[in-house]
Amino acid sequence: MTAKLIDGKAIAASLRQQIAKRVAERSQQGLRTPGLAVILVGSDPASQVYVSHKRKDCEEVGFISQAYDLPAETTQTALTDLIDRLNEDAAVDGILLQLPLPAHLDASLLLERIRPDKDVDGFHPYNVGRLAQRIPLLRPCTPKGIITLLESTGVDLYGLDAVVVGASNIVGRPMAMELLLAGCTVTVTHRFTKDLAGHVGRADLVVVAAGKPGLIKGEWIKPGAIVIDVGINRQDDGKLVGDVVYETALPRAGWITPVPGGVGPMTRACLLENTLYAAETLHD
């Protein structure tokens, strides 16, 4: 048995087409074009690449993209003032603060400063709290994208044993809440969990977001399980690999996401989806 691939690139492209179509329809109806403000502080190379992709995505679907590229020495006060201005700007439906920030800035305070109805990353405690209470509004992009990928398989998630590896605020914790919402029985683990192999081995669905290449061995995977690999790690030879040993997981899993081309494109597409949702449902 060889796993079926979950093609995040293709699913994300289809989602972007749907969003672009809706933006065009809004324009024909005389409605406002959705707007996304993207804030980049400093010159971290990876962040610059991510931000350029997000701005390109905005152009593709017809959003108005506002770019704020700030020097690394930008103060907490200056950034707070910018967020306050964007909060009050009716042309802005979403505010994205690219992480990580320079060490002297308090990311938690700044993320909380973004108005919850413009928090298209889904990081604000209000939006995380709504997800926990089973009334999601703006959902964290990576877990939301993963749910879309899982839905594309046609597999009924209700009642599945799901194991999340990694407990970050950005992926692991909200992912667990999304899977609970989908009716899974969820276990959250991390790289220091005792008998991690045992937990993974009984899972019908494994979502791995630990940031450690090759952490999950292919032989640990339960035959036929769904494997979602969120990890993206660059090796010395420049090759990108996930947190799962792909070559040995492929013959055991039922479904698997590739790295790259799996979860990453969906995270970006869901940022656009959240921005459109904010424009239509929260701001129109």
Curated annotation (Swiss-Prot):
Binding-site positions, NADP(+): 166-168, 232
GO biological process assignments: L-histidine biosynthetic process; methionine biosynthetic process; purine nucleotide biosynthetic process; tetrahydrofolate interconversion
Record flagged with keyword NADP: yes
InterPro entries: Aminoacid_DH-like_N_sf (IPR046346), NAD(P)-bd_dom_sf (IPR036291), THF_DH/CycHdrlase (IPR000672), THF_DH/CycHdrlase_cat_dom (IPR020630), THF_DH/CycHdrlase_NAD-bd_dom (IPR020631)
Pathway it works in: One-carbon metabolism; tetrahydrofolate interconversion
UniProt EC number: 1.5.1.5, 3.5.4.9
Recorded superkingdom: Bacteria
Keyword tags: Amino-acid biosynthesis, Histidine biosynthesis, Hydrolase, Methionine biosynthesis, Multifunctional enzyme, NADP, One-carbon metabolism, Oxidoreductase, Purine biosynthesis
One GO cellular component term: cytosol
Reactions catalysed, as given in the entry: (6R)-5,10-methylene-5,6,7,8-tetrahydrofolate + NADP(+) = (6R)-5,10-methenyltetrahydrofolate + NADPH; (6R)-5,10-methenyltetrahydrofolate + H2O = (6R)-10-formyltetrahydrofolate + H(+)
Recorded family membership: Belongs to the tetrahydrofolate dehydrogenase/cyclohydrolase family.
Complex formation: Homodimer.
Protein name in the entry: Bifunctional protein FolD 1
Gene: folD1
